[in-house]
Amino acid sequence: QGIVDQEKLRLVIGPGTGLGVCGLIMSPSGWLPIAGEGGHSDFAPNTSLEFEILTLLTKKFGHVAVERILSGPGIMNLYETLCQINNKEMIYESPSEITASAVNGGNDPLAHETVQMFCKIFGSVAGSMALTVGALGGVYITSDLVRNFLDLFVASEFQKSFESKGRLKPVLEDIPVYLSKKKNMGLIGTVYQINNQWIQKGFKI
């Protein structure tokens, strides 16, 4: 949903080993990336449970950047804190085990809660970053991690959380969100950028 404005800035965001964030603007020679370190911005909780999560992660890490949650290692951090809050033993020891359990209906309901919480926080962060850069051209999610639980992601509170920005909710409602299903997006982008840099000189891959 949303309205595409082809001439406006776009936001690309992707949880993986960390949280990658960049902008894309159109130039006479094609799309140009605006690099940044958005994954290291502060995690801002919105609910009492999220405040509890922040408190536990602060004790562990000191500064809690959003990629402490929105990444593969972040899913592990989130699962660990939810187990602590609920006084439960950790059953799983890797992000892949957690997401697989959530998708397949495993025997630990906290795995499912972890993925749901991940999606909700991801929506909030993506919405904030879309407002920060003015991403009226759309938000593009590129993440092998999210594709591991695609159906859960689509049915999650991501979109609701993305749009829940008070007076700016109407702005977020008009920003389309896309999830790329292609793999190796980093490599594809690298090839495109090489072409983009040299196109004026007549080189082509």
Segments the model singles out, each with a brief description of its role:
Residues L11-G14, L19-I25:
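Short beta-strand scaffold segments in enzyme catalytic cores
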Residues P28, S48, E52-I205:
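ATP-binding/phosphotransfer module of carbohydrate and carboxylate kinases, centering on a glycine-rich
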